[in-house]
Amino acid sequence: MLPIQCKMARTALEMGVKQLADAAAVSTNTIVRFERGEDLKPRTIAAIRTVLEEAGVIFLDGDYSGVGGPGIRLKAME
């Protein structure tokens, strides 16, 4: 997950920094730093990504990115 994908995912979910930080068991400063492009430990990024995926985000990376580059998509609501 790239920092911009984290920001896009939070925005799409209408999730605040504090809400994501609490759910991922990290500080709000950690989320802010990551979204600014600062490096985090891989396990911290994984924890944040897991919360976003469980909330319905699909990350578009690699072969799925196409011309537009990495992005996100929301799972269809049932």
Per-range role (PLM):
Residues L2, L13, K41-T44:
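Short, conserved glycine- and acidic-residue-centered signature motifs
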Residues I4-Q19, A76-E78:
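Short basic helix-loop element that most often maps to the first helix and adjoining turn
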Residues C6, L20-A21, I31-F34:
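Conserved hydrophobic/aromatic packing and binding residues within compact polymer-binding modules
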Residues T11, D22, R36:
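Alpha-helical residues within the helix-turn-helix
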Residues A25, P42-L60:
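DNA major-groove recognition helix of helix-turn-helix/homeodomain DNA-binding modules
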Residues A25-L40:
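Recognition helix of helix-turn-helix/homeodomain-like DNA-binding domains
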Residues V57-E78:
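Helix-turn-helix/homeodomain-like alpha-helical modules used for DNA recognition
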